[in-house]
Curated annotation (Swiss-Prot):
Name assigned to this protein: Pantothenate synthetase
Sites where the protein binds (R)-pantoate: Q57, Q154
Note: The reaction proceeds by a bi uni uni bi ping pong mechanism.
Record's keyword terms, sorted: ATP-binding, Cytoplasm, Ligase, Nucleotide-binding, Pantothenate biosynthesis
Phylogenetic lineage: Bacteria, Pseudomonadati, Pseudomonadota, Betaproteobacteria, Burkholderiales
The reaction(s) this protein catalyses: (R)-pantoate + beta-alanine + ATP = (R)-pantothenate + AMP + diphosphate + H(+)
Source organism (scientific name): Delftia acidovorans (strain DSM 14801 / SPH-1)
Length: 283
C-alpha cells in the first residue's frame, strides 16, 4: 500500500491508475470502515482510502482534539484489506489557508436531524468531501466513492451534492456493520464504559420497535416517536431524536397509505453517559 500526504503526489500516482474507488474516513478504523474498503475493491481499478480528521465538521464543544487517532493500526488494517493507496493529508494540505469558500447544503435535507443538533456539521462534511473528490478524481475524471449507511443522513446529503454539481462520481452505499448484539460499529464506541457498552444495544432495539409499530399503524406516528424517546430515556439515555422518515428525502411520511407502504427509515441519536451514538434502520 502506498501512502501519500500531498494532493500533488496523490494526483501524480492516480494519473496512470484508471478509475479510483474511494473511501473517505477519519481514521480509528473498525470493520465497518473495512467493509467499505472491500466494497471499493469491487468498484474501481484502484482502491483509495483517506484518513483526515476534519476540523470543519466539529462544533467547538465536540471531540476534535480527543478524537482517537490510531495511525499505525489503521495502516495495518487497510493494507490487510488490500487497499492500494492511502491519502493522509495534513491540515495544511487540505486547508493551506482559511477555508472561506464552503459548500452550503440544502437546508431541507441538512438542517434537520443531525443538522439540527449539530449546526454547521454538513457544511463541514460537504466542504471536505468536495475537496477530497477534487483531489482523488482529478486525474481520472471520475470514479466511485463508498459511504456507509450507518451515517444515513450524511449519505443522503453527499448524494444530493453529487447530483446538484453533476460530479462524475458514483456513490455506493455500504451496509451498516454491527456487533453480535446489534450495536452499530462506530469509532466513538470506544468512549463507552464497560457498563455502558452492555446497555448500548438499546438504541438499535428502540429503532426496531419504533419501525415495527409504525409499519403496523399501532398509533399516530408522533405518539410512537414520543413513546420511543420516553422508553429510551427511562433506560438512562438522553435522546436527541427517534423518528421515522421517508428514505428518499428524510421528510416525515404522511399517515395512512404512505406510512403503510412507502420505503421508510427509522433514525435515532442519543447520548449514553458522555457518548453520543447514532443509528438507523430501513424498513
Amino acid at each position: 500500500m502506498q501512502i501519500v500526504h500531498s494532493i500533488a503526489d496523490l494526483r501524480a500516482i492516480l494519473s496512470s491508475k484508471g478509475r479510483p474507488a474511494f473511501v473517505p474516513t477519519m481514521g480509528n478504523l473498525h470493520d465497518g470502515h473495512l467493509s467499505l474498503v472491500r466494497a471499493a475493491r469491487q468498484h474501481g481499478d484502484i482502491a483509495v482510502a483517506s484518513i483526515f480528521v476534519n476540523r470543519l465538521q466539529f462544533l467547538p464543544h465536540e471531540d476534535f482534539d480527543s478524537y482517537p487517532r490510531t495511525w499505525e493500526a489503521d495502516c495495518a488494517k487497510l493494507e490487510a484489506e488490500g487497499c492500494d493507496l492511502l491519502f493522509a493529508p495534513r491540515e495544511a494540505d487540505l486547508y493551506p489557508e482559511p477555508q472561506t469558500f464552503k459548500i452550503q447544503p440544502d437546508a431541507q435535507l441538512a438542517d434537520i436531524l443531525e443538522g439540527h443538533f449539530r449546526p454547521g456539521f454538513f457544511t463541514g462534511v460537504c466542504t471536505v468531501v468536495m475537496k477530497l473528490f477534487s483531489a482523488v478524481f482529478f486525474a481520472s475524471g471520475g470514479g466511485t466513492a463508498v459511504f456507509g449507511k450507518k451515517d444515513y443522513q450524511q449519505l443522503m446529503v453527499i448524494r444530493r451534492m453529487v447530483e446538484q454539481f453533476a460530479l462524475p462520481v458514483n456513490i455506493v452505499a455500504g451496509d451498516t456493520a454491527r456487533a453480535d448484539d446489534g450495536l452499530a460499529l462506530s469509532s466513538r464506541n470506544g468512549y463507552l464504559s464497560d457498563d455502558e457498552r452492555q446497555q448500548a444495544m438499546a438504541l438499535s432495539l428502540a429503532l426496531k420497535q419504533l419501525a415495527d409499530a409504525a409499519r403496523a399503524g399501532q398509533a399516530p406516528l408522533a405518539e410512537l416517536e414520543a413513546w420511543a424517546m420516553q422508553s429510551l430515556a427511562a433506560q438512562g439515555w438522553e435522546p436527541d431524536y427517534l423518528t421515522v422518515r421517508l428514505r428518499r428525502d428524510l421528510q416525515p411520511p404522511a399517515e395512512g397509505a404512505q406510512l403503510a407502504g412507502a420505503p421508510l427509515v427509522a433514525l435515532g441519536a442519543a447520548r449514553l453517559g458522555k457518548t453520543r451514538l447514532i443509528d438507523n434502520l430501513e424498513f
